[in-house]
Design a protein with these regions (language model features):
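Short alpha-helix in the alpha/beta-hydrolase fold that links the catalytic acid
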Residues: 292, 453-463, 487
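Short beta-strand/loop motif that positions the catalytic acidic residue
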Residues: 437, 442-445, 449
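Active-site nucleophile loop of the alpha/beta-hydrolase fold
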Residues: 308, 372-382
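Catalytic histidine-centered segment of alpha/beta-hydrolase-like enzymes
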Residues: 312-318, 380, 451, 471-473, ...
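Conserved acidic catalytic loop of the alpha/beta-hydrolase fold
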Residues: 327-345
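Conserved alpha/beta-hydrolase
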Residues: 289, 297-317, 472
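Gly/Ala-rich beta-loop-alpha elbow adjacent to hydrolase catalytic centers
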Residues: 347-358
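Extended, polar/charged low-complexity intrinsically disordered and coiled-coil segments in eukaryotic
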Residues: 2-264, 448, 474-478, 485-497
Length: 497
């Protein structure tokens, strides 16, 4: 589903006002309640009020929330600092950018069902793009600018500002004239004009702002200590439940896992006996996957669950604002496989986990024997749907409000997206997949996904030679449902294992 600027629905308004506003209001209430209780109420009034359990609960919460809010304010300021990231070099970035621009360029002559070799192009001309392909790209390109302005309002300097970030993670004014980055940026603006069949108006439109995740402010919304207590309690209880069901906690390098050995099952006679690595998505942690985990534990294969504190509200964990890097994830995955004697695995990833999945496919492809991607957000990242919808699209429906406030604006998640996001590194291309037969690859998408343009992803997969036997688009489903709700999506995932 493409991003929409439709007004907030009635259900969305109710969700925004009731749970969201109430959670937000707890901290201001705490700052009022503590001085009110100690400075305004008399001794007899304090005794009377504290006899009420609800008041006592709010008071104790306020005692915790006041100092915690100061800590969270400091942590949020700290999260705004720029972070040094390792980006692909100019030659690699040139190839990636051209490869992305090449996708969908010839819609009238699109070849479906043929796997494409790695691009060897060093440029892109206007003649290589038909008008249908240019029209689609004109719509997508606007999503890299706040409010999705008409293309006519995006001037050349605005476009250069975004391209400088996209290909060099730099501001145009900081790029040295004649440097490799400067050459690539100038090439990029010309290629983009060819791809769009559009020449940008000279100058800069001050009303237009580009979206540059690693440079823009971290968009985090405050939440009370009670929110983190509840979320972390759910996570700890989920860990405890897993450990009492035969699992272990193990650490390899900078990454930790919940693991369990094989459970022999005479019905398992195929390659489905491969160990399974589960890489979860954004949210409150493993607790949100409880329905899926109950069924996941019933699998006879060895299982591994990657722990990701930075996207699981674990605010006091050392990785909350300092998650392991791509190379550390790959090294840890190789280490756990070597320690356990695994020569190949099934990788199951969900939502944001599909970006980590992309790292593993490029860094340890030999170990990724079978790949299952649910609610995949790592395809077609250059089109801007995911970034715009997750961070900048006005909320419309109940699920968008819940995801927008309770997930996207949570500090750890916001910092991960805004300070650790290298789009070209988290991008998953068809060529990264070792095999594309149905036994080795399954991609599960949601028809009404408000983060991902499922139709565009399916079109890309078809254009790249991936057959319908490898793709499931769950009718009527919304983002996240594939592993949260036991319906068609989850059933397909479990069958794929």
């Amino acid at each position: 589903m493409a991003p929409s600027d439709a007004p907030l629905s009635f259900g969305g308004r109710v969700t925004l006002i009731v749970p969201t506003a109430l959670v937000w209001a707890l901290t201001p209430l705490s700052w009022v309640l503590v001085p009110y209780h100690h400075l305004v109420l008399s001794d007899s009034q304090r005794v009377a009020w504290t006899s009420r359990y609800w008041y006592l609960f709010l008071l104790y919460h306020a005692y915790l929330d006041v100092p915690f809010s100061v800590f969270l304010f400091w942590l949020t300021k700290k999260a705004q600092r720029p972070k040094e990231l390792v980006h692909p070099g100019p030659d690699e970035m040139r190839r990636i950018f051209l490869e992305c621009l090449e996708v969908g360029a010839k819609l009238k002559e699109r070849q479906v069902g043929i796997r494409k070799p790695r691009t060897t192009k060093t440029s892109l001309t206007k003649e290589e793009v038909d008008e249908m392909g240019a029209e689609v790209m004109r719509l997508k390109f606007r999503q890299w600018f706040r409010g999705r302005p008409p293309l006519s309002e995006i001037y050349r300097a605005n476009a250069i500002e975004w391209i400088a970030w996209a290909v060099a993670d730099a501001r145009p004014e900081d790029v040295v004239s004649g440097s490799e980055a400067d050459i690539l940026i100038n090439e990029g603006i010309e290629w983009m004009q060819h791809r769009l069949h559009h020449d940008f108006t000279p100058g800069r439109n001050p009303k237009v702002e580009s979206i540059r995740l690693t440079m823009d402010p971290v968009r985090a919304a405050h939440r009370p200590v009670g929110y983190y207590i509840v979320c972390n309690s759910v996570t700890l209880l989920t860990y405890a439940w897993l450990l009492t069901n035969g699992c272990r906690y193990e650490r390899y390098g900078e990454c930790a896992y919940i693991t369990r050995g094989a459970r022999p099952d005479k019905r398992s006679k195929t390659s489905a006996g491969l160990p399974i690595l589960f890489v979860h998505g954004l949210g409150i942690g493993l607790g949100q996957y409880l329905d899926f985990l109950r069924r996941f534990l019933a699998q006879p294969q060895p299982i591994m669950i990657l722990i990701q504190p930075n996207i699981s509200t674990q605010i006091f964990h050392r990785h909350f604002l300092h998650p392991p890097s791509k190379d550390e994830h790959v090294a840890s995955f190789k280490a756990i496989c070597a320690a356990k004697g695994y020569t190949g695995c099934t990788i199951l990833s969900h939502s944001n986990g599909t970006m980590v999945h992309a790292w593993l496919l490029r860094g340890a492809k030999e170990l990724c024997r079978r790949n299952v991607l649910a609610d995949a957000v790592s395809f077609c990242l250059w089109q801007g749907d995911v970034c715009y919808s997750f961070l900048h699209q006005p909320w419309r429906e109940t699920m968008e409000v819940l995801l927008g406030y309770f997930v996207a604006r949570e500090l750890g998640t916001a910092h991960t997206i805004c300070r650790n996001f290298i789009w070209s590194d988290m991008l998953l291309m068809e060529r990264d997949l070792p095999r594309t037969d149905p036994a080795s690859l399954q991609i599960i998408l949601a028809e009404h996904d408000f983060l991902v343009d499922a139709d565009a992803v399916v079109a890309y997969l078809h254009e790249s030679g991936i057959s319908d036997d490898c793709i499931t688009c769950v009718k009527g489903a919304q983002h996240g449902a594939a592993l949260i709700v036991h319906e068609e999506g989850m059933k397909k995932v479990l069958a794929s294992l």
